[in-house]
């Protein structure tokens, strides 16, 4: 039996928007608005790319992340199946 690795919601979200190249608006705690696509992230920072330029943003400075379009992280049919079991 293979061990199932669980990811936290933050990593799941960032990985999804990175892979799908979803455009984001990121608001920092000081009110600054950044826009771009996540190209890389780790436990401490996010690399945001826009118009050929990259910005390294520390996660502790991020207040809110808004994707440009709705993001579905989990399959709702899986939840229905697990509730019936």
Curated annotation (Swiss-Prot):
MF term (GO), any: RNA binding
Domain of life: Bacteria
Coiled coil: none
PROSITE patterns noted in UniProt: SM (PS52002)
InterPro entries according to UniProt: Hfq, LSM_dom_sf, Sm
Record keywords, A-Z: RNA-binding, Stress response
One Gene Ontology term from the biological process aspect of the record: regulation of DNA-templated transcription
Domain Sm residue range list: 11-71
Matches recorded under PANTHER family: RNA-BINDING PROTEIN HFQ (PTHR34772:SF1)
Name the record gives this protein: RNA-binding protein Hfq
Source organism (scientific name): Azorhizobium caulinodans (strain ATCC 43989 / DSM 5975 / JCM 20966 / LMG 6465 / NBRC 14845 / NCIMB 13405 / ORS 571)
Gene: hfq
